[in-house]
């Protein structure tokens, strides 16, 4: 069974540069055997809420930005 990962990122951080690398990041995790769920933050404390939501549903949580 494939492992699941949620990747939470702030699209406004770093002048939005992560958007250009997002597919490369996902590819790295896919090659590591992870199914990747991508979530962009929309408001203050959104990353915290996303972590709470996925804490029991995925094998790994990665946050950026």
Regions found by a protein language model. Give the residues of each.
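ATP/NTP phosphate-donor binding region
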Residues: 1-64
């Amino acid at each position: 069974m494939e492992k699941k990962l949620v990747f939470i990122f702030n699209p406004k951080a770093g002048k939005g540069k992560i958007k250009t690398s997002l597919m490369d990041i996902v590819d790295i995790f896919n090659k590591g055997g992870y199914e990747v769920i991508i979530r962009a933050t929309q408001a203050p404390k959104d990353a915290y809420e996303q972590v709470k939501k996925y804490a029991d549903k995925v094998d790994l949580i990665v946050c950026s930005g």
